[in-house]
Each structure stands twice: as C-alpha cells, then as structure tokens.
Amino acid sequence: MGRLSWASPIQRFRFFSYLSQLNGRRSVLACSGYENRYLSSLVEASDCELDEVPDDRKVAEKDTALHLALSQLSGDFDKDSKLSLQRFYRKRRVSVISTGSLNLDLALGVGGLPKGRMVEVYGKEASGKTTLALHIIKEAQKLGGYCAYLDAENAMDPSLAESIGVNTEELLISRPSSAEKMLNIVDVLTKSGSVDVIVVDSVAALAPQCELDAPVGERYRDTQSRIMTQALRKIHYSVGYSQTLIVFLNQVRSHVKSNMHFPHAEEVTCGGNALPFHAAIRLKMIRTGLIKTANKISGLNVCVQVVKNKLAPGKKKSELGIHFGHGFYVEREVLELACEHGVILREGTSYFIEGEVIEGKDAAEKYLVENKEALDTVVAILRNQLFKM
C-alpha cells in the first residue's frame, strides 16, 4: 500500500494493484489521486452551522400552491375532503365517560373512556365485563345521555342493572337474531349521533346468518371474522363523525400452537383481528380472587389491564372489587383515594367527612354508602384534582 501523509487537509496518495498474469507477465497498475481529510473540528462545526437563509419568495409560492390545492379539493370532491385539523378535533381535551371506578379512570390516563371511539373489553367468563359495561351506562345516563344495550348472549338481567344504578326505562335494549343485523344496528345508531353509549354483548355470541340457516355440523371457516372486518370499516367511519362510545365485550379462546416440538396454548379473542385494530382502547379483565364476608362469598377481585391505549400511555393496571348484585366497591376506593389526596382527613382510626367524625374504616365506608350526596361530592372533588376537569 502507499504511504499516506496527514500533514494537510488535501493530500496526495499512491497505491499499487497487482492484476492476474497477462501474456505470461504480471502487469502492474499504478494509480494516484487526491483525498480530502479535515483534521480540524472547527471546519466541521462551521459546515454544520451554516443554515440556509429563509427565502420569503419561496414561502409565498408554497402558500399559494397550498391554497390552490385546497381550492381544487373543495371543488372536485365533497366537504369531507376538506383538510382541517380543527374540523375533527374542536377541543384539545377529549370528552370522556367515566368507567364508574376512579382507579380505572386513573389507569386510562384521560379520566374515562373517550367518546367517538371503539373500545374492546375482553376476558374469561365471569370476570366482570358486563358489570363494567353497566357502570359505563350508568355514568353516561348521569350526564343525560341515551344508551343502547345490544344483547347477543340473551343474558341481560334488568334487576341487576337497576341494582347497579342503571335506569332501565331509558335504556334501549335489542336482541338481534344475527351478526349482520346486530352490526347494522350499531352503524345506524352511530350515524344518528343521538346515542352516547352502545354496548355489544358479546362478539363471541355473534352468529352469521348463514350459520343460523345451515344444519348443525356444517363448517363456515372465518365467516364471523370476515363479517366483523367489513362491518367495522363502516362503523369506524361513522364513529369518527359522532360522539358515540361503542363498547364491544369479547371472550378469549385457547389456541394451541406448536413451537419446535413444544406445543403451547395462546389466548386469542373472538372475531379476528379487525376489532383489536380498530379499538382505541383494549381492556383485559382477569379474576384474581374471591371476596368473603362472614364465611360467605360476596364478591370477587379483578385486575383490569390496559392492553392498548391510543390516548395515553398504556400497559397500566387497576385492581377492582365487585360486590355480587351491586357492582363495584366504589365507596372503598373513593375512601382510599380521598384520604391519599387530603379530601378526607384521617387521624388514627378516625375519619372526618363533611364535619362528621367517624370511627373505623368500615363505618366510614358505610357512611358513604348511606349518604350518596356526600359520596358524589367527594368524587367530584377527586375528579377535579386528579383530572383537572
């Protein structure tokens, strides 16, 4: 190789290349050239610091071209082609509906479930999915909204809904006979813009019309997935122009996979991949234990995992307690959060709630159960502090 000299930024170098034998002799090719070497950091810094001076004429040309393109779009297409961020997002803070649990609202990061989006709640049987859906309906009705419950499982219990606090007289309930009818109802109600919450219970129970008409035993591969894919594209378009919250309840199935001679079971949701894709938020509910009172099972503990969240950081968890026949243990978590944030004062075992001195945690929870006005006041103060609403 040639010897290089680093004495100057521009240097001369020489190298030799031995090629294969030609006509019995070895040919030698000699080349020379120049190479730039900048050894000073000052030269590199000066190159990076030289920014192009803004040209007002180019900026004006770009602005004129943009206005011409927008004028062409408005003339050639309908109003939906209008490019404007404020047209779709008029408020910086998204409108939400509470889940009925402050702990879960905190895990979601925005204070609840967003309007104008689709949400998937999935888990195994008896994990609290229906209870969560009824609490969402209850919170929406508090705000004066209309709600619809589409019961594909034929398992809606009006007495349970009323015990949780749902006004069943103002609740729209439907039991469509097929998946196509169910999803068409969702699309029509969403386009109307008059319904605040739509609950579909559940995706796993949606039966395509072809399966209902065929005898038992015939297989229709991926029919439900294809129907969900087509329908959710329409619903996703409709929900973008409304303030409707659509909650899909779903179940999980065990799918056995083989990995290099080691088969293992993997949990998958029903209905294919369309719903996980279109859903802005996905919640997974897991039973973690039972609640016993006087040696009797009175409820269960569940863990809600935020698997997907397009509005805030995801992968958070929330521990909830469900009282059979009454819904969430709201008073317990409100008392804990209120003491933590100074809304309710606690000294030892004494609690100071609205001028009342109450001894013991159980007595304080009972006081909140019996005094709904005090509970609502504490919840309002907490939501104002936690979410700055």
UniProtKB/Swiss-Prot annotation:
GO CC, one annotated term: mitochondrion
Q: Which GO terms describe its biological process?
A: DNA recombination; DNA repair; mitochondrial genome maintenance; response to heat
Name a GO molecular-function annotation: single-stranded DNA binding
Q: Which UniProt keywords apply?
A: ATP-binding, DNA damage, DNA recombination, DNA-binding, Mitochondrion, Nucleotide-binding, Transit peptide
Give binding positions for ATP.
G123, K124, E125, A126, S127, G128, K129, T130
Main localization is mitochondrion
What's the protein here called?
DNA repair protein recA homolog 2, mitochondrial
**Location(s) in or outside the cell:** Mitochondrion
Q: Does the keyword DNA-binding apply?
A: yes
The family this protein is said to belong to: Belongs to the RecA family.
